[in-house]
Amino acid sequence: MKKVIIATLLFTMLHSCMGCSDSQSDMEPIPVPQEEYMASDMVIYEANPRIFAEENAFSAIKAELDRIQSLGTTVLWLMPVNEPGVLKSVNSPYCIKDYKKLNTRYGTKKDLKELVDAAHAKGMKVILDWVANHTSWDNAWVTEHPDWYTQDANGNVVQPQEQPWADVADLNFDNETMQQAMIDAMKYWVTEIGIDGYRCDYAEGVPDAFWKKAIAELRTLDNNLLMLAEGGKTSLMNNGFNLLYGWNFHSKLKDYYAGKCSLTDLYAMNTSELEGMPKGTLRLRYSTNHDQASEASPIECYGGERGAMSAFVLTTMLEGIPLIYSSQEVAYPRSLNFFNYGVIDLKSNEVFAQEMAEIIRAYKAKSSVRGGELEVYTTGDVASFYRAAGSHGMLVMVNTANESVQVKVPMEHAGKTMTDVIAGVDVELPTVMTMEPYQYFIYQQ
């Protein structure tokens, strides 16, 4: 319980990115809407099969399940496992040739079933990436059912018009027969392999009516399926999704670390992203994922390993469900193109991984204050955050700058005796303290 409270605060403090100053006076609380959100200890690990093994990735991931679980993972998300297309291909795993066949480089249906069963035995759920908006150009549907695709005035199948994706053909969701074939394929992996849900790629590109129909039918097979929408619009949640991307918060987080916005701006984005979310639904929060890592690693985005850790703390502890992207746990220093195969040693930085696991343990321990009153502070480069519920409270202070700073402890907490969760000792909080670069304190009462 104690670890929970402190961890949460710590993460919030980490919001403040390095180098950005805030115009608000020190210690002025920023209003945060007091709404109840679903309490959840969910932690999602996004596994890119192409960095686990050049061949037989399902077996390679299975061999890593203990390590993945040790990070605190409760949900294993496998990036697309389907057979990829070749015609006009750029080697993207999101270019699907056959929805009911697997990428043979990853393994067999038996291998996938063994991976899912092994994850279940360890108490983890498994969700698959699902690409509903488009297929590869050599998908059999293109020649057998051209009316299942969007066509131009001359009857030619076209790529998605709103995206520069020339390697894929745009599906026509006005065609009810195509919709049912898609739903049938989604049901296939639930019934044949026993998966626990889907992460739905480019969910905003697919009509709401399809998602409502598909999710309703899928839940006749398993009412507890987890459905994650890659999209930012709150309206997606009305279709049956449980989780929605925190895109805007992530963009603001990167801007903050780049010195392009203030801490106040970041707090405001956190608030605005949560407005209008239906009860029982949450945002997925992340400091990186496969798209972001293909552009720049967290090490490059947030000012080194310590900066990257602070960004992870922030996204994990403020609000929502945390995501870990495979390679993030070893502080991989360079961009990582998910179109390519290339094995990464995911045990190469165990100290960093262990710290991430500690943060996740703190996240899971925060149940005593989850849903409690949140107060955030602007204190220069130090993010400060306090959450209280009943007799429990958590204060986190995080120096997000790569330099030592002197910072005032929030006035209402100065002089209190609280437990330093990391050190395991009781301390009387001073009025002013010195914090080393990226240093953080987590206090519990």
Describe these PLM feature segments:
Residues 14-37:
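Bacterial Sec-dependent N-terminal signal peptides
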Residues 77-89, 129-138, 201-207, 230-234, ...:
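Short, solvent-exposed turn/loop segments enriched in Gly/Ser/Thr/Pro and often Arg
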Residues 28, 32, 191, 201-286, ...:
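Active-site-proximal helices and loops of the catalytic beta/alpha 8
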Residues 312-333:
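Substrate-binding cleft of secreted/luminal carbohydrate-active enzymes
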Residues 30-75, 79-193, 213-222, 226:
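Substrate-binding/active-site clefts of carbohydrate-active enzymes
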Residues 397-401:
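Asparagine-centered strand-capping/turn motif at beta-strand->loop junctions
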Residues 429-445:
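C-terminal beta-strand-rich structural cap/linker in extracellular carbohydrate-active enzymes
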Residues 4-13:
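Sec-dependent N-terminal signal peptides
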